[in-house]
């Protein structure tokens, strides 16, 4: 029984099967054949066509092969959103290798762990992170490092100004060590090699993405070439009443080392034969907004913290930026407040939908409909060819009936799930059982097939035998007019096992006391759910896509108690 199928937007396909036996390389090259000068990427005023992307990635693939990179080898990509990331990734794929996408902002400890986790022997790195990679190289299997400068694909004048004014200050002026080779030198060398001849199958491994770090050191989730094509088709199909082939400009500010962008935005852009506009730093809110204005971006995948930051920025409050080109937004990573949704939709005359995915799902799982009913607090319904059931937490072979009283673990069946964690069969077996992905998220499904997340299985707070869902408390706190951001977790308590604690960032110019917050919560929550402790902060620790790291707050609290 799949009640969600009856609530899809009109005209959307209920299934996309059978999926074509293709790779994203094939998809890209179909556009090269049909419209070679269609723009594939825009970066700071530079446009790169599908044909040019094909040529550059061929050149890089040839260079990798000549360096000894073999089919199945892992090549680490340690870069933000710059054209070299996309060129290198397609080049890695054409060489038959696996792209291991690593957050360049990792600490040296985290970076060494990621490199060792995937076993990469080659790393492509932006110059300002070169020293970091070199510092940990001896702790890893990395044999060769390929540096690339952020300025390489800037327009001529901007490149000159960057060289004169910013290159040294930003840490991008480097001397490379013996044995390492510049990215552009490899492009020149490989450009004389023609079309790579390595045979790449849809079932070959294409991608390693690292889990988000909300539960400790990251694990390496593996996706195939077919995974990416399926994900791209699912996303494009869900939005096909708005997105049109060849026409749309995907604002890509979310980092390409993250599942949202790499297994979601990028495949959907190529499947739709659209354009990706790259923004290297999603935290640079003025740059994000000015890029939307200049490039007339139409599709804006984002996260709640970015929507909030834009709404309160002077460029918006003083009407100094035009965001009217946006016709569709998708929000992920954390819950989107209804107030934020309504204000941003009013600002842009666009529609915001919410999506739900995990690194392990390799993107598309659930999404709210574009035209159908919006249900506050819901992550939407399964997209085409995805099935979701709510499993009993005591016996996960049993599925729970519909309704808010039947909370269980969200379990997914889908054709695009990860193959597993790289060389971690035990961890894989915990997540993947008989072809189903056990998410660790608790929630319920209503009779229309809409799914509601209650909380993470591991984050439930136990107060005197009662269960408290942090998200429920956070949703109440977020309604307080003085609260900008908040997070809730359980801290040890000798009397009640755990106590509820809230960490709060106040809106600029607003004030509140712990007593104010507690009184507000008592009006809406049962007594044991009201935060016993309230801490005001200037900011909350977040992941690279703006997800609040509850674990870090709990860790800080534990350190205070010792």
Predicted regions and their residues:
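Conserved ATP/PPi-binding loop(s) of AMP-dependent carboxylate-activating enzymes
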Residues: 381-385, 396-431, 468
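AMP-binding/adenylate-forming catalytic core of the ANL superfamily
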Residues: 125, 300, 414, 419-420, ...
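Conserved AMP-binding/adenylate-forming core of the ANL superfamily
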Residues: 18-20, 37-82, 86-90, 107-112
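Conserved AMP-binding/adenylation subdomain of ANL enzymes
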Residues: 229-249, 259-298, 313
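ANL superfamily adenylate-forming
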Residues: 6, 134-202, 314
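Gly/Ser/Thr-rich phosphate-binding loop
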Residues: 147, 294-302, 315-374, 387
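Conserved beta-loop-beta connector loops within the AMP-binding
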Residues: 389-411, 447-448, 510-514, 549
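Conserved adenylate-forming
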Residues: 67-69, 190-203, 208-252, 274, ...
């Amino acid at each position: 029984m799949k009640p969600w199928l009856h609530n899809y937007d009109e005209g959307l396909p209920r299934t996309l099967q059978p999926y074509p036996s293709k790779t994203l390389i094939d998809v890209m090259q179909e556009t090269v054949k049909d419209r070679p000068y269609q723009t594939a990427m825009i970066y700071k005023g530079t446009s790169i066509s599908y044909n040019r992307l094909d040529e550059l990635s061929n050149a890089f693939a040839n260079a990798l092969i000549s360096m000894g990179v073999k089919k199945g080898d892992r090549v680490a990509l340690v870069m933000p959103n710059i054209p070299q990331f996309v060129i290198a990734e397609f080049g890695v794929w054409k060489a038959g290798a696996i792209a291991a996408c690593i957050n360049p902002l990792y600490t040296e400890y985290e970076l060494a762990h990621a490199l060792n986790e995937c076993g990469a022997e080659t790393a492509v790195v932006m110059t300002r992170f070169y020293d970091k990679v070199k510092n940990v190289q001896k702790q890893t299997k990395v044999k060769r490092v390929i540096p690339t400068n952020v300025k390489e694909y800037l327009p001529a004048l901007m490149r000159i100004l960057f060289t004169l004014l910013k290159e040294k200050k930003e840490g991008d002026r480097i001397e490379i060590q013996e044995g390492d080779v510049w990215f552009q030198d490899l492009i020149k060398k490989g450009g004389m090699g023609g079309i790579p001849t390595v045979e790449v199958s849809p079932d070959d491994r294409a991608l390693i993405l690292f889990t988000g770090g909300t539960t400790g050191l990251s694990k390496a989730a593996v996706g195939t070439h077919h995974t990416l094509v399926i994900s791209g088709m699912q996303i494009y199909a869900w939005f096909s009443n708005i997105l049109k082939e060849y026409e749309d400009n995907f604002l890509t500010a979310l980092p390409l080392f993250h599942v949202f962008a790499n297994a979601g935005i990028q495949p959907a852009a190529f499947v739709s034969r659209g354009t990706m506009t790259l923004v290297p730093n999603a935290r640079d809110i003025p740059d994000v907004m000015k890029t939307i204005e200049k490039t007339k971006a139409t599709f804006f995948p984002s996260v709640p913290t970015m929507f909030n930051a834009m709404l309160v920025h002077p460029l918006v409050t003083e009407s100094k930026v035009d965001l009217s080109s946006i016709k569709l937004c998708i929000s992920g990573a954390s819950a989107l407040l209804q107030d934020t949704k309504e204000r941003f939709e009013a600002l842009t005359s666009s529609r915001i939908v919410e999506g739900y995915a995990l690194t392990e799902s390799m993107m598309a799982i659930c999404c709210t409909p574009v035209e159908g009913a919006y249900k506050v607090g819901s992550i939407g319904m399964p997209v085409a060819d995805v099935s979701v059931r709510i499993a009993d937490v005591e016996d996960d072979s049993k599925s729970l009936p519909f309704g808010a009283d039947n909370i269980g673990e969200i379990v997914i069946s889908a054709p695009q799930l990860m193959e597993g964690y790289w060389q971690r069969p035990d961890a894989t077996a915990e997540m993947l059982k008989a072809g189903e992905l056990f998410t660790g998220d608790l929630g319920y499904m209503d009779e229309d097939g809409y799914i509601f997340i209650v909380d993470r299985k591991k984050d439930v707070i136990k107060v005197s035998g009662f269960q408290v869902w942090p998200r429920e408390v956070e949703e109440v706190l977020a309604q307080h007019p003085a609260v900008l951001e908040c997070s809730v977790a359980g801290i040890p308590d000798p009397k009640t096992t755990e106590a509820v604690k809230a960490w709060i960032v106040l809106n600029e110019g607003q004030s509140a006391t712990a007593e104010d917050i507690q009184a507000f919560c008592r009006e809406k929550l049962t007594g044991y759910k009201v935060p016993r402790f309230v801490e005001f902060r200037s900011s909350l620790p977040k992941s690279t896509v703006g997800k609040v790291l509850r674990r870090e707050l709990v860790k800080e609290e534990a350190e205070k108690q010792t």
